[in-house]
Amino acid sequence: ELESGERIEGDLFIDCTGFRGLLIEQTLNTGYDDWSHFLPADSAVAVQTESVGPPVPYTRSIAHESGWQWRIPLQHRVGNGMVFCSKFWSDDEATSKLLGNLAGEPLTDPRVIKFTTGTRRKHWNKNVIAMGLASGFMEPLESTSIHLIQRAVIRLMQMFPYDGVRQPDVDEFNNQMKFEIDNVRDFIILHYHVTNRRDTKFWRHCSSMPIPDSLQHRIDLFRET
């Protein structure tokens, strides 16, 4: 039901309402698995700057005391941001660090974004399928969000409920999405956990924090071989 009172009916709904999850969470109360204990970064500050010289053909990810900075060259500007953990840096500290490490003049004011890394307990619940930020959030260290959206779209095309929603299809969709998202989660955690950096409380925390059994298994296999 819309704010106007108009009622929209349908057999299948795709929830693309971002962090709010208007259908998957606020309507269906699907639940959210919080992964902050695995990926402690919970904030970002972003700013656009002028380009300085020809754009390089890659994105830079630069480690800092309590997080990391992105620098993305675009056609007419550069995207910059700092991902950080609010337990170790305040918004002002992160913003100051970012502004002190820019290559060009800022074009926009810094904008702070808060997030909770994690995933919906079900991506497909009843006749609602969550995609994008409505399905969960993975910090942008490897820009995996677009990949996960593409995978969800392809999977829905392969399993589209032409004859109506059936629970076995729903369960299989959720199982496949969970497997894929868990792999991406472990991939991102690995960047933090296996680093040799120990010079700040943040990096010492990352090296000693608990990790999923699935990732520990892979690390053990790698070390044994």
Where would I find each of the regions flagged by the language model?
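Beta-rich nucleic-acid/ligand-interaction surfaces
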Residues: 117-118, 173
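Solvent-exposed, non-transmembrane amphipathic alpha-helical segments
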Residues: 33, 91, 100, 148-154, ...
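Long, low-complexity C-terminal extensions of enzymes
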Residues: 158-225
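Short catalytic/ligand-binding loop motif for oxyanion handling, primarily in non-cytosolic enzymes
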Residues: 21-24, 138-139, 181
